Design a protein with these regions (language model features):
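Acidic, metal-coordinating catalytic segment for phosphate/diphosphate chemistry
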Residues: 2-46
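A glycine-rich, hydrophobic loop/mini-helix early in the fold
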Residues: 29, 37-66
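Hydrophobic alpha-helical segments that drive targeting, anchoring, or assembly
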Residues: 31-32, 37-39, 49, 74, ...
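A short gly/proline-enriched turn/hairpin at secondary-structure junctions
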Residues: 68-72
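Unchanged
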Residues: 74-161
Length: 174
């Protein structure tokens, strides 16, 4: 059941960002090539917010998903990058610039019983002392990457850790 048709601008931006993503999971690029031939489920977008030491990630406690990066559904008229930025602002009050290349592209279901769709993960780095404002009912917290967290997406921990290591290499840290 397709809940909303994804507009052409969003799909075109998703194709470009999927190609530019640092990491690909679940055969996402091939899935997108096939899925764009017909109506698609709404796209998902999230932001992996790292502290400047790349030792922590900012997570939001979702009511049934557990601890997850800030994110959500890409709204009509938005690109995935715009949707990720909007969700980050709504859920944390933060409005940093996202890094140029998306962190990852994956295929997943964001709700039990819903079909899978494309999810794009973007990244940013902010000072851990930067104040944030949590959305009502969704606490926000810095979480150390050397510790785990409860989430309905168990692969996220390793994926986010790998991206932090990749960023550290790009920044000349080891």
């Amino acid at each position: 059941m397709i809940r909303n048709v994804v507009d052409k601008r969003a799909v075109e931006a998703a194709v470009v960002d999927a190609q530019r993503a640092v990491a690909e999971f679940d055969g996402a690029r091939q899935w997108l090539a096939a899925a764009r031939q017909g109506p698609m489920e709404p796209l998902g977008a999230e932001v992996w917010v790292f502290d400047t030491t790349l030792a922590q990630v900012l997570l939001v406690k979702h009511r049934w998903r557990g601890w997850v990066p800030p994110g959500g559904k890409v709204e009509p008229g938005e690109t995935p990058r715009e949707g990720a930025s909007r969700e980050l602002l709504e859920e944390t009050g933060l409005q940093p610039e996202l890094l140029p290349d998306p962190a990852a592209v994956a295929v997943r279901s964001y709700h039990p019983g819903y079909p899978v769709t494309l999810g794009l993960s973007y990244a940013t780095v902010v000072d851990a002392a930067t104040p944030f404002v949590a959305e009502d009912g969704q606490p926000v917290a810095w979480t150390r990457l050397d510790e785990g967290w409860e989430s309905c997406f168990p692969d996220d921990l390793l994926r986010i850790r790998q991206h932090a290591a990749w960023l550290a290499g790009r920044m000349g840290r080891h």
